[in-house]
Amino acid sequence: VYGFQIDLNTSFTGEDSLDISLDAGNGATAAGSLTGPLAEFDINGGSEALTVDGVSYTFPVGDSMTVIVGDNTDGSALFTTACAYGGPSDTLSDCANVNAGITNGGFAVGAAYDFGNGLTAAVGYAGPETGIMTEESADAYGANVAFDGGNYGLSLTYGSLEDAGTDEDTYTALNAYYSFDSGISISAGYEVGDIGGALAAVDETEAYFIGVNGEVGPGELGAAIGTVGSMQEAGGAIPERLMYEAYYSY
């Protein structure tokens, strides 16, 4: 099993960026996506031919605003999640911001504003390439506020995801990190969600995470524990299913 990806970018003014992602791989199942442990490593699959995976254009508007427009791009591309952890698995690297940071791809547009002194705010939209913002389409909207104090940070993210009908799922994620002078960082995240249209006994979701990482020798050592994605309520209670990892990279 293998996956290959190359990211190309260029600038027309020195302040903008045109980004194109090309990938290939043979790791997909017959259903078209990876399952099991391999899915955690974001291995491209589906075609061994080189394909265009995403195209986006990012540009400034004035001195403090940045705008992005893209295809097969996340609506949260300009969001800031206060998390210093970045391990090998996709799930724990989300830092419990599983659904609020909308990542459903498709056509996307977003904007971020830098207020200065570490405070930023951003909004984003993502939906299918056809039927954008219609009653029949499954659209996603999100907003994010973050503060970065240099060695610590906080962020609050809200996401609203529509299904093909009239129901709407909403999620709110809170993230924080702190970096010590020794180079060790601690990150934590917590997300709650409400499944629109679901019965009262199964309409809540929860995700949480805590991770530690820092420089050790020539590389980085880290470990984390958290829920296996977003856990949905069952029978009036949210089940506890955890995953953990430890890594060393150099």
What are the residue ranges of the model-derived segments?
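Alpha-helix capping and helix-loop boundary segments enriched in small/acidic/polar residues
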Residues: 132-133
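A small/polar (G/S/T-enriched), proline-flanked helix-loop surface module common
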Residues: 85-86
